[in-house]
């Protein structure tokens, strides 16, 4: 069975020549919940963009067995959905229904299929009954859930999320963690919140200076005080308090 994501010796430089990612090699199995952790500017968000083909570098990226090329971006993006750092970037239609239906409509699904996809996605994220709400009237937590619904309606096998817990209060952050752990898709989550990462991930990948430092079981990596501090990261509270 193909891996969910395979990356081999991938590198990327910004237009000004600054190196953003260097020789990234990473294998991700289906069904995993991956936390990409590292200091600000480490390359986490850039790597998420590369996975979906929004930026192109050197090396190889394979998504669910499909090698990413300029000619198959549409196929690749049917397998991997992206939740951007600012959920409002994915909420641009008059109603929530329209936003969640946007992807399925562009896939060419008929009206009934679209309606079913929208209903299922909104139900999954806890926004049933809000289909006709204007997105700008939603709370921060609801906007984040809505942005996830716009991806779920496309039925991808893999979902990437860039700082999904940003701007959320503790209760909404806990609600989001519960939502994400209830999804069956492979999740790749870039976050600076170690407590949030520890609540969700079964696997952690530390990225620093555009390179993968280590990857492995989340509990082992995130409870390693020396390793975490060497890369400017805090050990999650659950390990400090002996809850793990």
Named regions from a protein language model:
Residues 37-39:
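The feature captures the beta-strand-to-loop junction immediately N-terminal to the Walker
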Residues 211-234:
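Conserved beta-strand-loop-alpha-helix hinge in the C-terminal portion
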Residues 134-138, 142:
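Conserved ABC ATPase signature
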Residues 59-68, 76:
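Conserved ABC transporter NBD signature motif
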Residues 112-130:
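Conserved ABC ATPase "signature" region
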């Amino acid at each position: 069975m193909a891996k969910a994501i395979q990356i081999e010796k991938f590198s990327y430089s910004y237009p000004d020549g600054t190196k953003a990612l260097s020789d990234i090699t990473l294998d991700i199995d289906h069904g995993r919940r991956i936390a990409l952790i590292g200091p600000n500017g480490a390359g986490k968000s850039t790597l998420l963009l590369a996975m979906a083909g929004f930026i192109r570098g050197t090396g190889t990226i394979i998504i669910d067995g499909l090698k990413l090329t300029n000619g198959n971006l549409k196929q690749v993006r049917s397998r991997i959905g992206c939740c951007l750092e600012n959920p409002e970037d994915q909420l641009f239609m008059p109603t929530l229904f329209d936003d969640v239906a946007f992807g399925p409509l562009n896939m060419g699904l008929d009206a009934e299929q679209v309606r079913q996809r929208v209903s299922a996605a909104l139900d999954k994220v806890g926004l049933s009954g809000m289909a006709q709400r204007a997105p700008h009237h939603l709370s921060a937590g609801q906007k984040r859930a809505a942005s996830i619904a716009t991806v779920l309606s496309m039925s991808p096998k893999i979902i990437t999320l860039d700082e999904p817990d940003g701007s959320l209060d503790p209760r909404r952050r806990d609600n989001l963690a519960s939502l994400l752990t209830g999804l069956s898709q492979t999740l790749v989550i870039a976050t600076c919140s170690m407590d949030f990462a520890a609540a969700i991930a079964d696997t952690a990948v530390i990225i620093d200076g555009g390179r993968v430092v280590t990857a492995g079981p989340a509990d082992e990596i995130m409870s390693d005080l020396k390793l975490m501090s060497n890369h400017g990261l805090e050990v999650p509270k659950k390990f400090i308090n002996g809850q793990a």
